[in-house]
Amino acid sequence: MFGMSIRKFIILSALIVSGCISHPETIDIDFDSGTEDYTPLVRKILAEHPAGEVTIRFGAGTFDFYPEQAAGSYLCVSNNDNGYKRCAFLLEEMRRVRIEGAGEKTQLRFHGAIVPFRVARCEQIVFEAFTIDYDASFIFEGLVVGNDPRTHSITLRPLDPERFEIRSGEPWFTGYDWASPFGENILFDPGTRSPYYQAEQYEHDQKKTLQAEWIGDSLVRLSGYSSRELPPVGSVYTDKGPHSTNRRYPGFSFYKSAGVEVRNVTLHDSGGMALIAENCRNVVCSQYRVEVPPQSGRMVSASADATHFVGCSGKIVLRACRFESMLDDATNIHGVYMTVVDRLSGNRFGASFGHFQQEGFDFAEQGDSLVFIDRADLGVLGCGRVEEVNHVNENYYIIRTGFDLSAIPD
């Protein structure tokens, strides 16, 4: 009898506990031809759910997002370009948030200088069943229809001539609210949709200024082309702008978050990494695709890596994904080094990054363990637990650890 009472109590307790588990609220957003910008609506929904616990479910249709009313934040994103960003979906310190669509029938289209998704210090975040694109690519593309070794010039037919401009005689390409001079460039073979073999022989030296002129309504001549070989007729010239300014708008930016999943999502364009995760734990990409839109005529999807993971832990899962036509790696998984530049005391030192696109990275925090190595041979010099970190600026941190550096020679 007593045992039966205990069993009843356990069953009753389980029922009571399960009944207390809350379920995230679901908010459906249907396409409305009268809504030009869905950014304010999404910002309002997220503001009304500061802790998360919400599912935002988009129906079929193309949903547009503009930067004017997007939430802003200064972002230091590793291997991308730091700066103040407008973010269409800005999730901070939230848990159990889902952004869903109706599969291929749902397109989220972003306009101009805007980061689609920023997730910071969150848990259990899911993106599922939609397509991401921009109104205008962050890449200039033009078919080479002529070249002249005598004048060091090439003639292009721009894929989007309305986005090409000539400013002070030099070539620029534009978007909704941005404009870029020409810079880093690479040549594609339209037959194979891959870069030309030994493509560097066709790359224009960015230190040399190109001059541009219209030839009729649809052709552009670029003069002063400086390369070992001129791009052959029939190739596709692509340009993503100057180094240090062409990785400003990653598609997905995840920071210090856990349990983030991207499922059945297609990304057609991004002005930086398609997906970057920093100091995250357990990130899963399943049926995540980075590719150009069908029948678009484009050679390039994302302007950098399809996926990139920095300082992450737990599991990184890439399952049944497809990455093509981006201008960098399919995936890149690594940590970060800092250089000791000042010895302030035995266990206190100043440190800087070795690459400008890692500046501002959250390198370490109290309780982490650091390994000190000799940069000449990567030999381990010692280990120490972090006691304090002071971010003086993006490229100078003062760090105190339990390891005494005074015995280590310069």
Task: Name each model feature, range by range.
Residues 20, 194-247, 380-383, 389-410:
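Small/polar beta-strand repeat architecture
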Residues 46-47, 64-98, 109-128, 135-152, ...:
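Extracellular beta-strand-rich solenoid/capping regions of secreted or surface-exposed proteins
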